[in-house]
From Swiss-Prot:
NADP(+) binds at residues 48, 54. It is an enzyme of class 4 (lyase). HAMAP family: Chorismate_synth. Its cofactor is FMNH2. It comes from Chloroflexus aggregans (strain MD-66 / DSM 9485). This reaction introduces a second double bond into the aromatic ring system. Its EC number is 4.2.3.5. Pathway: Metabolic intermediate biosynthesis; chorismate biosynthesis; chorismate from D-erythrose 4-phosphate and phosphoenolpyruvate: step 7/7. It catalyses: 5-O-(1-carboxyvinyl)-3-phosphoshikimate = chorismate + phosphate. GO terms for biological process: amino acid biosynthetic process; aromatic amino acid family biosynthetic process; chorismate biosynthetic process. This is Chorismate synthase. Pfam families: Chorismate_synt (PF01264).
Length: 364
């Protein structure tokens, strides 16, 4: 099965299934000498981990990462970095009664029709547990980006019809919804609790911002920065829409409103007075903040009775029991951050190959 790797120079390959022995990843192309230890990876995995609050799946996994290769004496060696997380709390018997049924909203049917065989335990490879490898690889990408001053922050912008009205970055990790608006976060928790009681689930929007991105990243024509960001985000389970900058809002603007005037800043750098473009023009970063929004569907695993068919086309009624997220949003945040970091790290290294010498501005 192809399609398990992402990136050109900084390349991530993930492996493993939800109820298999382990999940993990291999990162290839990371330069030698980057300071890195297990704590750097574990910090991000803990933010993605199941069972961390009442608004996430109650599956109990420590998600403790082991680095198997590519790091020596606290620094990367330049060789492939392989990391593993062992699954310790898979309960496959929860799926015994529905293993031959096609769960609505899941990949059961499409995997069956493509491969003729599938791992029915917790979704197998199509499970969101696969994203552990993305977050682990993204943690390394973030360390690399930090060497040039790039920082990334993500948060829950909207749950159903509840949207953050205040942006307080310090508030994001203070509440279990990872929402920058404390008042709206409390309402979101109440709404999730209600959905869980009603055996239902909720979707919403996560926003991710990258700051300090140097201008010049991106590879026209088919590897435009926004194209790779779109591919990265759409590859995340449950994502049904992606916007960059003003996104679909540009359809309501005139050119005179949407254009961002260029200016020369006091430090001599070139910038814009507004950021409708979301930090990317012509597929190349401008140096402004990169702003990405992801629309996530409500989790498909709900305990309500649902009509479907089995592998033979016979009508059946199923109830998906077990331990599932009533909303993916809080745990989606670190995954989305990781994918943006992977794209930017890859393009940072690609840019260093693009010219004999490179700086943010070259007048020579």
């Amino acid at each position: 099965m192809p399609g398990n790797s992402f990136g050109h120079v900084f390349r991530l390959t993930t492996w493993g299934e939800s109820h298999g022995p382990a999940v993990g990843c291999t990162v290839d192309g990371c330069p030698a000498g980057l300071p890195l230890d297990v704590a750097d990876i574990q910090r991000e995995l803990d933010r993605r981990r199941v069972g961390q609050s009442r608004v996430s799946s109650q599956r109990r996994e420590a998600d403790e990462v082991q680095i198997l290769s590519g790091v020596f004496e606290g620094r990367t060696t330049g060789t492939p970095i392989t990391m593993v997380v062992y699954n310790t709390d898979a309960k496959s018997h929860h799926y015994d009664t529905i293993k031959d049924a096609y769960r609505p909203g899941h990949a059961d049917y499409t995997w069956d029709v493509k491969y003729g065989f599938r791992d029915w335990r917790g979704g197998g490879r199509s499970s969101a547990r696969e994203t552990i490898g993305r977050v682990a690889g993204g943690a390394i990408a973030r360390k690399l980006l930090a060497t040039v001053g790039v920082t990334i922050v993500g948060y829950t912008l909207q749950l159903a019809d509840l949207r953050a009205e205040v942006f307080d970055e310090a508030e994001i990790e203070r509440n279990i919804m990872r929402c920058p608006d404390a008042r709206v976060a409390a309402l979101m928790v109440e709404r999730v609790d209600q959905a869980r009681r009603e055996l239902d689930s909720l979707g919403g929007i996560v926003e991710v911002r990258a700051r300090g991105v140097p201008p010049g990243l991106g590879e026209p024509v088919f590897d435009k920065l926004q194209a790779d960001i779109g591919k990265a985000m759409f590859s995340i389970p449950a994502i049904k829409g992606v916007e960059i900058g003003e996104g679909f809002g540009v359809a309501m603007l005139r050119g005179s409103q949407n254009n961002d005037p260029f200016i020369r800043r006091e430090d001599g750098s070139i910038g814009t007075t507004s950021n409708h473009h979301g930090g990317i023009l012509g597929g190349i970063s401008t140096g402004e903040e990169i702003v990405v929004r992801l629309a996530a569907k409500p989790p498909a695993s709900i305990a309500r009775p649902q009509q479907t068919v089995d592998r033979d086309g016979n009508p059946v009624t199923i109830e998906v029991h077990g331990r599932h997220d009533p909303t993916v949003l809080p745990r989606l945040v670190p995954v989305a951050e990781a994918m943006l970091a992977l794209v930017l790290a890859d393009h940072l290294l690609r840019q260093r190959l693009a010219r004999v010498s490179w700086s943010e501005r070259d007048d020579g």
